[in-house]
Amino acid sequence: MSAADKKPLIPPSHITIKIKSQDDICVYFRIKRDVELRTMMQAYSDKVGQQMSAFRFHCDGIRIKPNQTPNELDLEDGDEIDAFVDQIAGFSHRH
């Protein structure tokens, strides 16, 4: 096969991302690489019945901002995002 016959490797325009909760509940989303993750974050929040502001989303230990895209984060098909519930109040122990 000549070099002219080889097609360049073009990544697919969509990828599947798994969002995993602290309770090990997984929700899968198919998203475009160049669309802000805000859409997926909002859809996840709606699916679990919480406001988006109640969650922190992380990938490989790095917090994800809603305006970032999969391309900016180098996300690949099958990658996992962790969804953590923000703690609203602390605990105070008084004697």
Curated annotation (Swiss-Prot):
| Residue intervals passing through the bilayer | none
**InterPro entries found in the cross-reference section:** Rad60/SUMO-like_dom, Ubiquitin-like_dom, Ubiquitin-like_domsf
Q: Which domain of life is it from?
A: Eukaryota
> Which compartment or compartments is the protein found in?
Nucleus; Cytoplasm
Supply one GO CC term from the record: cytoplasm
Instruction: Look up keyword Protein biosynthesis and say if it applies.
Output: no
Query: What Gene3D superfamilies would the database entry show?
Result: Phosphatidylinositol 3-kinase Catalytic Subunit, Chain A, domain 1
Q: Where is this cross-link: Glycyl lysine isopeptide (Gly-Lys) (interchain with K-? in acceptor proteins)?
A: 90
Q: Where is the Ubiquitin-like domain?
A: 13-90
Q: Name one Pfam family in it.
A: Rad60-SLD
Which keywords appear in this protein's UniProt record, sorted alphabetically?
Cytoplasm, Isopeptide bond, Nucleus, Ubl conjugation pathway
Other noteworthy facts: Stress conditions rapidly and substantially elevates the amount of SUMO1 and SUMO2 conjugates with a concomitant reduction in the amount of free SUMO proteins. The SUMO conjugation system plays an important function in stress protection and/or repair.
Q: How does it assemble?
A: Interacts with SAE2, SCE1, SIZ1 and MMS21 Covalently attached to a number of proteins.
Q: What does this protein do?
A: Ubiquitin-like protein which can be covalently attached to target lysines as a monomer. Does not seem to be involved in protein degradation and may function as an antagonist of ubiquitin in the degradation process.
Q: Report the sequence similarity comment from the record.
A: Belongs to the ubiquitin family. SUMO subfamily.
- State the protein's name: Putative small ubiquitin-related modifier 7
Query: Which species expresses this protein natively?
Result: Arabidopsis thaliana
